Amino acid sequence: MNVKGKAILSMLVASTVIVVFWEYINSSEGSFLWIYHSKNPEVGDVRAPMGWWFPSWFNNGTHIYQEEEEDVDKEKGRKKEQREKDDREELQLWDWFTPEKRPEVVTVTSWKAPVVWEGTYNSAILENYYAKQKITVGLTVFAIGKYLEYYLEEFIASADRYFMVGHKVIFYIMVNNVSRMPPLELGPLRSFEVFEIKAEKRWQDVSMMRMKIIGEHILTHIQHEVDFLFCMDVDQVFQDNFGVETLGESVAQLQAWWYKADPNEFTYERREKSAAYIPFGQGDFYYHAAIFGGTPIRVLNITQECFKGILQDKKNDIEANWHDESHLNKYFLVNKPSKILSPEYCWDYQIGLPSDIKIVKISWQTKEYHLVRNNV
């Protein structure tokens, strides 16, 4: 075959191949097999398979990725909502309180309030709950006259060590002479505020007037600064952790000398003329005014009602046997406390140490009345 014949043959073969290829790719079976196994059913252009596959893959991939992101976000949202719900939910008594662990003592009152003894509470559950709340606890203390020099420094030092460890605390210190304040060094999360008040001529009046003063400070600033507030006598010392197990709406302290006595033996005010009067046959416990507390609003109510009774007695020319403590007992008889602290939280070692006192949280200081009760 000559050169011209070969050229013609080559052209025929090439034309045949082109025609066959063109028919194939436009047939129902033709495709770019390495990209997609069938033609785009909507687009007849040979470029359609590639043009459809790339954006479709990208868009589908993005859609799946977005769905995964949305699922993750929804799960995070659900967990956050659950955490916020847990934070808002009130801690239930039986979540942390096990009264049957102390069968030898009274652990629940007739009105179902807990009496907190060592061994009846779960510290871990309580700490976890209150840590989430980010609480601040206030503590008022009065150091008037010689009480300042004899007791204040040790009281604050021991409170700094044992009172509400790990939580923010504000000490409200009431003195009649700021210049005699000892230097105070406090740990992290602790601060103090000092207020100068008038010294009364009688220690009884100092004791009773504190109700008025505490109420005034709650109204002007304390209610905006703390979540819970305790009011304590200065002539005692912390010896072990006084923690969040003591927190409640209204908290009363059992008096160490009377916690086993019959109510008819209590030294309640028995004279009908007094606003603090409690007749024989009535009464639940004898409460110690050395420690009481609760939410600021409830403590405000306690102090206002007690001071109202004190003023009524003054008007009627009578003074309750145990002054503000008598009025406090009358208040808690009418307005039952939501939580009671066992004598372990305010113990007098002169009683000894009976078997039901497992650990002493606060102890009374030696009462040097002949030295400290002259406040002039």
From Swiss-Prot:
Give the membrane topology, semicolon-separated if more than one.
Single-pass type II membrane protein
Which positions are annotated as binding substrate? 142-147, 233-235, 255-258, 267, 367-373
Q: Which is one Gene Ontology cellular component term of this protein?
A: Golgi cisterna membrane
Residues annotated as glycosylated are: N60, N301
The keyword Transmembrane appears for this protein: yes
Residue ranges crossing the lipid bilayer per the database entry? 7-25
UniProt: Mn(2+) binding residues: D233, D235
Kindly list the cofactors needed.
Mn(2+)
Q: EC number(s) per UniProt?
A: 2.4.1.87
Residues exposed to the Cytoplasmic side: 1-6
Q: Where is the active site?
A: E325
- SUPFAM superfamilies in alphabetical order: Nucleotide-diphospho-sugar transferases (SSF53448)
Tell me a Gene Ontology molecular-function term this record carries: metal ion binding
> Catalysed reaction(s)?
a beta-D-galactosyl-(1->4)-N-acetyl-beta-D-glucosaminyl derivative + UDP-alpha-D-galactose = an alpha-D-galactosyl-(1->3)-beta-D-galactosyl-(1->4)-N-acetyl-beta-D-glucosaminyl derivative + UDP + H(+)
Q: List the disulfide bonds.
A: none
Q: Keywords, A to Z?
A: Glycoprotein, Glycosyltransferase, Golgi apparatus, Manganese, Membrane, Metal-binding, Signal-anchor, Transferase, Transmembrane, Transmembrane helix
The family assignment reads: Belongs to the glycosyltransferase 6 family.
Q: What is this protein called?
A: N-acetyllactosaminide alpha-1,3-galactosyltransferase
